[in-house]
């Protein structure tokens, strides 16, 4: 089951953007890096796709959605991009100004960090926004499959999804749940801009080692 609805976002250091808006598309992201050159060298962060599963997933979806994604990668490389395996490592550096931008950061972590660190801003890319879902399943060999089934049923219920959205600050996927931190609201705001990763056996493609090596 898909339990959440979490976008990949740009994050930025608000005090670094008092004279211009932060980039809101990948083309604007590339343009910003080229225009600012040495001023932002070493101040861009994203996931290390060799060590971060979510980073690899987001980059693989970028390759499918955006024909010119390698221009983004080249621009970040020229800007001395720093690579990390965790969201918190990037967000910490954006919040204190060591980084001006973070690319493809998991939105739920970014939102939690921004709520506690007012200098962190978030942009849902206007060209397209990749969305991933956390998956829940009960293994065939589970010792207590009924308990696992009840656990998933609760988190898929209106009550469970509401707790997830309001208390855990993780966007709820259920259409029965309303509010700011839900798939319903994101779809109303962004419509076709959202590009969810389909929850299907096709997800196994992203575990294929040949595909990972090619990317």
Pin down the residues of each PLM region.
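An extracytoplasmic/periplasmic, membrane-proximal ligand-sensing/linker region
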Residues: 172-215
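Extracytoplasmic ligand-binding site segments that recognize negatively charged/polar headgroups
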Residues: 1-95
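A bilobed periplasmic-binding-protein/Venus flytrap-type ligand-binding module shared by bacterial periplasmic
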Residues: 9-16, 58-60, 133-144, 163
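Hydrophobic residues within well-ordered alpha-helices
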Residues: 94-97, 138
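Short amphipathic alpha-helical coupling segments at ligand-binding clamshell hinges
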Residues: 68, 72, 134, 143-155, ...
């Amino acid at each position: 089951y898909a339990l959440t609805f979490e976008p990949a976002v740009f994050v930025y250091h608000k005090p670094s953007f008092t004279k211009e808006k932060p980039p809101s598309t990948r083309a604007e992201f590339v343009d910003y890096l080229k225009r600012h050159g040495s001023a932002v060298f070493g101040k861009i962060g994203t996931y290390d796709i060799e060590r971060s599963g979510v980073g690899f997933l987001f980059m693989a979806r970028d390759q499918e959605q955006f024909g010119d994604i390698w221009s983004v990668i080249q621009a970040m490389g020229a800007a001395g991009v720093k690579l990390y395996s965790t969201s918190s490592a990037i967000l910490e550096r954006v919040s204190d100004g060591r980084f001006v931008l973070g690319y493809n950061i998991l939105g739920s972590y970014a939102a939690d960090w921004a709520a506690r660190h007012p200098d962190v801003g978030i942009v849902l890319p206007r060209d397209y926004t990749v969305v991933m879902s956390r998956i829940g399943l009960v293994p065939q060999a589970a010792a207590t499959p009924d308990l696992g089934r009840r656990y998933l049923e609760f988190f898929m219920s209106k009550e469970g999804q509401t707790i997830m959205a309001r208390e855990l600050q993780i966007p709820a996927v259920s259409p029965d749940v309303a509010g700011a931190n839900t798939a319903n609201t994101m779809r109303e705001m962004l419509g076709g801009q959202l590009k969810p990763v389909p929850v299907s056996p096709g997800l196994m493609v992203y575990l294929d080692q040949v595909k990972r090596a090619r990317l």
